[in-house]
């Protein structure tokens, strides 16, 4: 035991029995005791999750994913939220960093997000078809994705975290993005957007 929770992906098999989704070689690399427990591929493929993990069954936690899409949830104002899928381009790779801000100065919130995961488990394809992209809000929960020629943002590595601020104090929102095994990049807003108003409070020594 390492104290780290391991994920066992499962799927419904014949007669609605739950079986591991990954091959023995993949899951065994994560949980080596399975090689001895299952014996061979034939026995493993015909076993249910409960049969394979009977000894650990009481300590397992079952979680269910209802969607793998990247979504926005709009507050309906009555205690309920409306789910809205982000554009198709966003669904090409997992999102690891996201920030909200008005990047074009039209008074409508936009998004900047970072994607990609090149380092995956054995047997899984890299999830690196995404990039860092800016989504311009329409004001109704829908967005237009700027291409690289429009935004000038070209980051195709494993983006992780983003931070938004007016780094050069010109009244426009900029952003910085960090990457796994890549350089941290700062992008200064060079658009013709309307400049924001900077408010500085300066009264007593207490609130300076």
Model regions and ranges:
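Beta-propeller-forming repeat regions
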Residues: 1-208
């Amino acid at each position: 035991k390492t104290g780290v929770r391991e994920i066992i992906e499962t799927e419904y098999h014949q007669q609605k029995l739950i079986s591991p989704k990954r091959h023995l070689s993949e899951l065994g690399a994560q949980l080596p005791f399975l090689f001895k427990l299952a014996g061979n591929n034939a026995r493993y493929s015909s076993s249910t999750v409960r049969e394979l993990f009977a000894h650990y069954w009481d300590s397992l936690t079952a979680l269910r994913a209802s969607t793998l899409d990247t979504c926005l949830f709009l507050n309906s104002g009555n205690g309920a939220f409306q789910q809205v899928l982000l554009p198709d381009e966003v669904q090409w790779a997992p999102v690891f960093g996201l920030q909200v801000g008005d990047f074009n100065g039209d008074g409508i919130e936009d998004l900047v997000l970072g994607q990609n995961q090149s380092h995956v488990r054995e047997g899984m394809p890299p999830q690196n078809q995404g990039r860092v992209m800016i989504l311009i809000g329409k004001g109704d929960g829908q967005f237009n994705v700027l291409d690289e020629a429009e935004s000038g943002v070209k980051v195709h590595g494993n983006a992780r975290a983003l931070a938004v601020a007016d780094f050069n104090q010109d009244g426009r929102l900029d952003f910085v993005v960090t990457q796994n095994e890549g350089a941290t990049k700062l992008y200064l807003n060079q658009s013709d957007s309307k400049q924001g108003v900077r408010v500085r409070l300066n009264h007593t020594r207490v609130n300076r």
